[in-house]
C-alpha cells in the first residue's frame, strides 16, 4: 500500500482464516521509505503528460518489485500479492482514477500472482472508487461501532442497519505534512507544532465553509481537491506563523471528524494520525464517544492489511466493493488478476 502522504510503501504478510467469521494474523510488516527523489517524483506526477507517467511507471514497478522481493525473502508459502499501486489521479466525478504500478510486469518480476487496480471497475460502475476499506472493517473489526482512518485523508466506516456507509471526511496528513515541511520536519510529531500555535479564526471559518463538507455520502477526496481548495486558502495566511496555520488546520480536522460521531459507541482509530496526540486530544474535546487506538501494527498497517483482504475476496470472486459505500450501481468483486 502506497498512501497519499508519501511516507513510503507499506508491506504486510497476513494469514487469514475463516470459521464463522474472518480472522487475521499479521506475520510480518515493514515500511519501505521512498527516497527524496521518489517523493518529489510521485508528488509531482499528476502534472506530467501520459507518456511521462508511463515512463515513471516502468521505474516504479521495478522499485515495487525490489521492495517486495526483499520483504518476502524469508517468507515461504505466499499465495498471492495484493497491491493498491500509487494514486496519480482520482476524479471519479469525471469518470477516471489512476494508480500506477498495476501492471502484469510486476507479477512477472516477483514471480507470484498479483491482484491489483481495485478502484477502476467501481468508477466504471458509477461509483467513487473509494473508500474501499469498509469491507475489511465490516469483516475484520466487527467489535467496533465504526472505524476511523487518519492517513493522507480521514475516512470513516459507519454501520447503518443492514449496510455500511463510508466516506472521506477531510484531508489530514497530506496537508499537515506539507505545513510541517516548512519547519524542516517530515511531519508534526505528536502534534507538538500545532499545540504550540494559536487559532486563526478567519482561516478556520474559510475551511469550515468549503462546499465538500455540505455534500452527502457517498463522496471521496483526492489530491486534486486539496490542491484546488485547501492549499490556496492556507497560502492566503502565509504571513502567519506556521505553528498558527497548522494549529488551525488540526483544529479544523478535529471539528469535521467530531461532527460525525454523535451517536456512535466505540471508534477504532488507525493511520499515522493516531500518533498525533494533540489531534486525538481535540477529537476527545469535540466528541464524547470512546476512541480506541489498537496495537502499533494495526495502527500503521491497517490499510495494507485490508487491501490484502480485498485481494483474497477478489481471488475467491466474492464481493469486495460495496455499492452502499461507493455509490456504484451494484456490489461487485473488483481487481485485475495477473499471473507470472
Language-model features: locations:
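Conserved non-catalytic scaffold segment of RNase H-like nuclease domains
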Residues: 22-59
